[in-house]
Structure formats: C-alpha cells, structure tokens
C-alpha cells in the first residue's frame, strides 16, 4: 500500500447531527478529550465562566448556547485521523447544515434519552438519506430520567425509517445508572459519576453470568437478564453492509456530560464507518487514492478570529494530497493559484498545514475570490455535484442607521452572503438591499454580526416578497424580452445571478405560465 493509500485508510470524516439541546456541543468536547485535543473539557453548564465550549466560537453562539456555524476539528485517535464537523443545531440553519453533510462520509446522531426523536433530527436524517450516509446513534443523558430504551429504538425505526441495532444496553438510569452491557461481547462497562472533565480508566466486568455482575446489579439483576432476552429476541443484530448502505444504525447509550459511552461511539466510527469515499463530479467519479489533488469548497466563514479580519474557505479534499506551497487550478475562474498557507483546524487552534489527504478538511484564506461549491484541482476541469443553494423563504428590506456607512454595509452583507449565512438581493429598479433567509434567526445573526464585526448598525422592514427564483433561459432574445417586462421584480443576488422576486404565489404561477421558455429555479447548484 502506498503512503497516500495508507493515510487515506486512516481517515474518518463525520458530522454530528441532533436537535438543539440534545447534547451535541458536550459530546463534541468529549470526543476532543478522547483524542486528547483538549486537556480539560469545559462543561457547557459553566457557560457563564470563560470556559465556553470550544467549538461554539461566535459571539452570538456564546450568548445563546447553540452552535450556529459549522466548525471543523481534527484529532488523532487509535492510529487514525478523525475529522469532526459540527453542524448548526438551530432549525434556521438548514442550508449550512445541508452543505456540511455533503462533505462527510458518515454521521453521528445524538438523541436526548428523555425526549427521543425530535423534529430537527428528522429533517437532518432526511438529508443524510439522500446520500445514504451511514449513521451511528448515541442515546444521551442517561444520568437523567430517560424513556424506556426499547420504546426509543422502536421510535428510531418507525419515525426515521432505519433499522436500529443496539450495541450496548443501559443498566438503569438517573440515580440508578450503573453502566452499559455490551450485547455481542458479553461484558459490563461500569459507570462512575463525576468524571466529566477528564479521561478515566474504565472498569469492566467480564460476563453477565458472573458473581461480580450479580453483585454490581444487585436486586436489578434478574429483571435486567429478562429485559435482555426480550431485547435480543426483538432487535436487529448489527450488520456492517446494511450500516454502510445507510439502512441500519448501531445504537449506543451513555451520558456525554458524565463522559461515559462517548469512546464507544468513537470506536464505532473508527472500526465501522467508511474511509473517504469516491466523489461524483459532472465529468467523472473521482477516487480518493488518485495521485492528483482535487477538492471542493462547502462553506465560507468570515472572521473566525477577531485578531485576523479574514474569511476562510473550508475545503473537503476528494483525492490526492495537499502539500504546502503547491499550485492548484481554481476551476471556475481558470486561474492557477499557489497555496502556501492552508490551515488545519486542530480543535479551533488554527495551525499551518504541511500536508493533508483525501477526507481532510483544510482552510484556505479567501479574499473574496472563492465561492461555495468551487472546485480546486491540479489542472483537470472538474466540478463536483450536489452542493445546492435553496431559495429563501423569508425576506426583509435592510435599513441603515448611519447613511454614511453604506459601503461597509454592502461589503459586510456581500461577505456574509458568500458564507451562505444569508442571501442578499439588489433590485434592478431601486437602491434597496433585500435579505433572504431560511429562518428568522438568520436575520438576528446578520444584524448582530454586522454590528460586531463591521461596526454597522441596521434594522429591518417587512417587504412583500413571496419567494425568490433564479432565472435560467438559453434563448437570449426571450431572456431580454422577459427582463424588460419583469424589471420591477428583478434583482441580482450576491453572486451576480439574475433573480425574480415574486410578490405573491399567484404572481409566480402566472409568470411561469406566461414565460414557458424561462426557467424559474427554486435551487441553484453552486458552480
């Protein structure tokens, strides 16, 4: 096996998906602790102190305790290199989350044991299903009261339409939580409370049918053995192929806050989840072990570091190897660029990178030339598919408090739009600036970031726009005719694309009927 193939085989790139408050930030920290990437996990409960969760880095996230932006963390674990992508936990950020899920090979679903499957989890699973992403499941919060575990598995199967195969099974919960039993390998992992901040040696009891196990379970022993018989009779056994096909999820139980069970999940990702997978481009399928470099940008993030006024483009490497100072072709612009200062995200510590392989996520400094969906290669003309822009559902007109700052406002909005955090439209017939978003929180985020990072204060006004549609028409004459007729409702988006802002649903239906040669698109691929 070549050095490159060996490095690719070591890579595991996955994202965490969950409903807000299911414990995603906590589990992220504990995973980093496993990889020794952070020495002490600052519990999310001590939010008021300075120990903010390592992955929630933007000011507004610190205040609200939700991860709004996707951060990327890389850490070593058991001779592997793990790339963990944290996805926004708030329902408003579906676009950002969707794009993040295009950059991973597997996902970890975190469920709150007291609540089970929640709406946000369902939406994220729908996205994973589009690509048959393999899913590992973690039922969290066993240090509190949880629902009946069998009921939780039934719910996963019924609601998420995926087979659930329990790997570990909880022994009690809340104050009676004694640990978990490994179904296939017949041993108990003992839970001891109060070790949330550090890695501790794990106590194991070999064999359920042993005096030690009887002593540990006490009066619960017989009831637990009966429950296990029921579980083993009723539940699916783990099947590696079904897992890789996205049809079955292995289920683990634990408490992220108590730092228990997180290592079992990480072991599952390393042992069972796929190494970097081939990627489909319009031109051909790209294999990760190919010698030539290729990668695509799935996210742009402004101002990751208040000390550096910068924008970072996050790129998933699809093939080949990145070497410091190498020359790459920016396919959309046709320009060759030398990349000497790509970053790796070693738990939000930004480090200069010497080399990286397929599956890794690297950061490129972006001075406004890179867009989401851009492909970089060593010369070949490739464009990777499936990185969409969605038409926003909510619109507001932006009003500037200080008219002298209109340049900063435009610059700020342009950069935030490049990030995909919002969409910005400039109407052809007025000097208005219109923002589009998928959820209300995005407007708050934009206003707070404009104030925080660009020192611009703005407010919003309602505007009658029902929806936006990207205009596509191969007949130039027809397009010109349409543009003249519809000019009152036409705008250009942040990327320079012609957009129709429909005032009502009826208007949109009429226009589509009246102009059959013009395509009104609700999504637009980044390319």
Curated annotation (Swiss-Prot):
User: What molecular functions are annotated in GO for this chain?
Assistant: GTP binding; GTPase activity; guanosine tetraphosphate binding; translation release factor activity, codon nonspecific; translation release factor activity, codon specific
Q: Which InterPro entries match?
A: EF-G-like_DII (IPR053905), EFG_III/V (IPR035647), G_TR_CS (IPR031157), P-loop_NTPase (IPR027417), PrfC (IPR004548), RF3_C (IPR032090), RF3_dom_3_sf (IPR038467), RF3_GTP-bd (IPR041732)
Q: Which SUPFAM superfamilies match?
A: EF-G C-terminal domain-like (SSF54980), P-loop containing nucleoside triphosphate hydrolases (SSF52540), Translation proteins (SSF50447)
Q: Which UniProt keywords apply?
A: Cytoplasm, GTP-binding, Nucleotide-binding, Protein biosynthesis
PROSITE patterns hit by this protein = G_TR_1 (PS00301), G_TR_2 (PS51722)
Cite the binding residues for GTP: 18-25, 86-90, 140-143
> What are the tr-type G domain coordinates in residue numbering?
9-277
Enumerate the subcellular locations listed in this protein's record, separating them with semicolons. Answer: Cytoplasm
Q: Any one cellular component term from GO for this entry? A: cytosol
> Per the UniProt entry, what is one GO biological process?
regulation of translational termination
Look up the domain of life of the source. Answer: Bacteria
Please report which protein family the annotation says this sequence is part of.
Belongs to the TRAFAC class translation factor GTPase superfamily. Classic translation factor GTPase family. PrfC subfamily.
What does the function comment of this entry state? Increases the formation of ribosomal termination complexes and stimulates activities of RF-1 and RF-2. It binds guanine nucleotides and has strong preference for UGA stop codons. It may interact directly with the ribosome. The stimulation of RF-1 and RF-2 is significantly reduced by GTP and GDP, but not by GMP.
Q: What is this protein called?
A: Peptide chain release factor 3
Give the originating organism.
Answer: Pseudomonas fluorescens (strain SBW25)
């Amino acid at each position: 096996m070549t050095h490159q193939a060996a490095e690719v085989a070591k890579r595991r790139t996955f994202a965490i998906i969950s409903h807000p408050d299911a414990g995603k930030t906590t589990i992220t920290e504990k995973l980093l602790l496993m990889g020794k990437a952070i020495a002490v996990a600052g519990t999310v409960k001590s939010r008021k102190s300075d120990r903010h969760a390592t992955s929630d880095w933007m000011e507004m996230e610190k205040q609200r305790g939700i991860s709004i932006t996707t951060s990327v963390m890389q850490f070593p674990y058991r001779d592997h290199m793990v790339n963990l992508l944290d996805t926004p936990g708030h329902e408003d950020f579906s676009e950002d989350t969707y794009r993040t899920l295009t950059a991973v090979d597997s996902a970890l679903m975190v469920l709150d044991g007291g609540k089970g499957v929640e709406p946000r989890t369902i939406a994220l699973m729908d996205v994973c299903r589009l690509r048959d992403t393999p899913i590992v499941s973690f039922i969290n919060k066993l240090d509190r009261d949880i629902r009946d575990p069998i009921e939780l598995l039934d719910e996963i199967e019924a609601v998420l339409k995926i087979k659930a195969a329990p790997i570990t099974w909880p022994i009690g919960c809340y104050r009676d939580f004694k640990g978990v039993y490994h179904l296939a390998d017949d041993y108990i992992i003992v839970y001891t409370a109060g070790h949330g901040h550090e890695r501790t040696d794990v106590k194991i009891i070999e064999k359920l049918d042993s005096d030690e196990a009887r002593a540990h379970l006490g009066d619960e022993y017989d009831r637990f053995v009966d429950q296990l018989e029921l579980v083993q009779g009723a539940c699916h056994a783990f099947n590696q192929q079904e897992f890789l096909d996205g049809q079955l999820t292995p289920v683990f139980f634990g408490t992220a806050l108590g730092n228990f069970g997180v290592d079992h999940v990480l072991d599952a990702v390393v042992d069972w989840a796929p190494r970097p997978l081939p990627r489909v481009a319009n031109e051909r399928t790209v294999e990760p072990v190919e010698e030539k470099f290729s990668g695509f940008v799935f996210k742009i993030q402004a101002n990751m570091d208040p000390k550096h006024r910068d924008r970072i483009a996050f790129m998933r490497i699809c093939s080949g190897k990145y070497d410091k100072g190498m020359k790459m072709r920016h396919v959309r612009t046709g320009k060759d660029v030398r990349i000497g200062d790509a970053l790796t995200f070693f738990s939000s510590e930004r480090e200069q990178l010497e080399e990286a392989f397929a599956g890794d996520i690297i950061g490129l400094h972006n001075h406004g030339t890179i867009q989401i969906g851009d492909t970089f290669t060593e010369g070949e003309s490739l464009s990777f598919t499936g990185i969409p822009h969605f038409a926003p559902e909510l619109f507001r007109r932006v009003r500037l408090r200080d008219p002298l700052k209109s340049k900063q406002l435009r610059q700020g909005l342009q950069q935030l739009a490049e990030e995909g955090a919002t969409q910005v439209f400039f109407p052809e017939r007025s000097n208005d600036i219109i923002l589009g978003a998928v959820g209300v929180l995005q407007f708050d985020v934009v206003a707070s970031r404009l104030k925080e990072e660009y020192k611009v204060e703005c407010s919003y006004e309602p505007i009658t726009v029902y929806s936006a549609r990207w205009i596509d028409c191969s007949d130039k004459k027809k397009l010109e005719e349409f543009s003249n007729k519809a000019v009152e409702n036409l705008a250009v988006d942040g990327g320079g694309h012609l957009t129709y802002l429909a005032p009502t649903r009826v208007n949109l239906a009429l226009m589509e009927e009246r102009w059959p040669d013009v395509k009104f698109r609700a999504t637009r691929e980044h390319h």
